[in-house]
């Protein structure tokens, strides 16, 4: 029997899809190339709240360059977001859904110029765009610049563009020093230009750490020149670079769930897409980790309302999945929250590592990011032991002195309710390479606002953050 060549064949050969993904051998999700730490992850987390940081986003995301007279139509047809009023020098958080209304992924779309866009984000939404560009009769050209290898093994790495963010309460001081004068603070997700070391650099008003800042990018060959200039200008303001260890944990404070399971494994309307996706695609090799267990892969799917993307849904245009979303009552859907994990229970998890007489310790909780799969799914339980939600992104904030997770829970559960998160996997753990033999623990966790950071809740200008759960 020949080896599978596409996702549909992988699924047919793999038996139960949940079992296949929960036992994937892909390993941990890696943020490649960037050094794990430049100082230490605690100081780096502290700096994005108290001084300024340089995030290096050059290597861990797919860049998809989309050009042509149908480029805007391709995006409009595949996104829940409204295309009305979208024009060059504005960006959107692009969210596509399946014909059944479930989220595929998300990313940022930069409207660079007439008929010219770039998507930046994880693979699932990029793959969806490429599929429709190739099969939908659109007059577009696509350049796919894949993320850097997770383990380059000493080989040179090349991208089309470098991508940084300058963030933190003193970020604008750094930015204006670099620029050589006052720089207008544009509205959220608006684009402009600034000067860095004699170069004209494009900018996006953005923030990931709960304070206004800029995302900036340029040709890859100018990366070192730009980076050195930023670090030099930032010295007097306490700016430090953030490594790949701390970087992904910033979303625990700002409230974005980066990795919902792409909801494409079932449904006749998606069969052609599964046949298009190669056997080594993100979707075919990705891993699910956590205590939530169902034999039905669809129980891991989420719709936009469940992870805070309700404000993006606009029925002012035709798009894939519109009919399914129109049939949903948003008020009855699960809602995104932060769960603040109990400190005493966390101490118990770590104490178990030093218990020489126990048969097994609790699942290791890595710091600052505790996820151990591409897609994370821990069961959230109420006092009666009923599953009332799914915890989807987990780690520790040195700024808050808390273990936190981003979750979607039943809509009627108010902020302040104590629930439990079942930490670890059943029966000693699955066969994933990231899972050691362990036992499970029910960790108390209080339903809390999202974003958890007060700064993020009060200063963000865009999208779902203004519709944050606060009560």
From Swiss-Prot:
Observed effect of gene inactivation: Disruption of the gene leads to significant growth retardation on both vanillate and syringate.
Impact after mutating residue 62 to A: No change in activity on vanillate
Record-listed substrate binding positions: 31, 60, 122, 247-250
Gene Ontology BP, a term: lignin catabolic process
UniProt-listed InterPro entries: GCV_T_N, GcvT/YgfZ/DmdA, TrmE/GcvT_dom1
Top-level taxonomic group: Bacteria
UniProt entry keywords in alphabetical sequence: Lignin degradation, Methyltransferase, Transferase
Gene3D superfamilies listed in its UniProt record: Probable tRNA modification gtpase trme, domain 1
Pathway: Secondary metabolite metabolism; lignin degradation
pH dependence: Optimum pH is 8 with vanillate as substrate.
Signal peptide: none
GO molecular function term, any single one: methyltransferase activity
Binding site for (6S)-5,6,7,8-tetrahydrofolate: 57, 93, 120, 165, 215, 256
Coiled-coil stretches: none
Important for activity (site feature) positions: 60, 247
Keyword Methyltransferase: yes
Reaction it catalyzes: vanillate + (6S)-5,6,7,8-tetrahydrofolate = (6S)-5-methyl-5,6,7,8-tetrahydrofolate + 3,4-dihydroxybenzoate; 3-O-methylgallate + (6S)-5,6,7,8-tetrahydrofolate = 3,4,5-trihydroxybenzoate + (6S)-5-methyl-5,6,7,8-tetrahydrofolate
EC number(s) stated in the UniProt entry for this protein: 2.1.1.341
Temperature dependence: Optimum temperature is 30 degrees Celsius with vanillate as substrate.
Effect of residue 147 to A: Loss of activity on vanillate
Subunit structure: Homodimer.
PANTHER family: AMINOMETHYLTRANSFERASE, AMINOMETHYLTRANSFERASE, MITOCHONDRIAL
Protein name: Vanillate/3-O-methylgallate O-demethylase
Lineage: Bacteria, Pseudomonadati, Pseudomonadota, Alphaproteobacteria, Sphingomonadales
Gene that encodes it: ligM
